[in-house]
Amino acid sequence: EDKNVTIYSPYYGMGANHNRGICFTADMEWLSVEGLRPDPKEITLMVKEHRGYEPFSLGRFNTVYIGGTIHELGHGLSLPHNHATKAESNLGTALMGAGNYTYRKEWREKGKGSFLTHASAIRLLVHPLFSGTTKQSKEVPNLRFRKLGVGQENKSIRITGKIESEIPTIAMIAYNDRENKNQRGYMVSNDYDATTWVSVISPQNEFNIQMEDLRDGNHQIRLVCVHANGATTTKRLHYVIDQGVADFERANKEIANISAN
């Protein structure tokens, strides 16, 4: 017998930083880890959320709402949205992209499931809840760029730099976010398509990032430095690609401003 379920996005997550974040979720009788696996009873739930009732298998229901909860927990732990690169897509769908709709689908042989991108994983690595320490967690890194440059190399963009910081740094992440049609700016609801590219910080405090999967259009690079205490420092660069050729005029002005401060 079909079961009617009315549900309205029973989860919400937001992280101000590595020290402050929230995640709310609501439980119910149809949600369980076992519900992510094949259902021998083939239960169908008639689910109403933003539209009229539509049929969900028990597995799909748990994928969407447990996956959604974990996605929102990621926000509570200060993870932003991101999208799998072409190479990463072999692993499935990025959890902090649309991975809430694919979570544990591989258990039912319905797809590749979801995964944490390298960028998300490295940010969690130093989050106080995972590192097990709050030492210096409230201290400000006071990051400075001693060198910063960006340029195109064939079908990729290379970002290089040298930094210094009062809190040790472990990695630099470039969120490459294209401005979509009818999009205003690069606000949180418009960043699901931001691919991420990571460089560890060398012993000489240098980084070297190569961004691929280039597309025509206006772009924002959010250059995020990850510090050992869980903190992040963000700088923004903007560029345009037209017919495969990148224009860094605005980015170079922004680099000059970043380097001067």
Summary of predicted features, one role per range:
Residues I7, G185, D191, H238-V240:
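Intrinsically disordered, low-complexity N-terminal regions enriched in serine/proline/glycine
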Residues N229-N261:
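Short beta-strand elements
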Residues P40-E42, G113, H238:
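General N-terminal targeting signals
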Residues E1-L77, H81-H83:
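Active-site-proximal segment of zinc-dependent metalloprotease catalytic domains
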Residues I7-P10, E166, A260:
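Compositionally biased regions
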Residues M28-W30, E34, N180, V188-N190, ...:
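Extended interaction regions within the primary functional domain
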Residues D27, D39, H118, D193, ...:
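Serine/threonine-rich low-complexity intrinsically disordered regions
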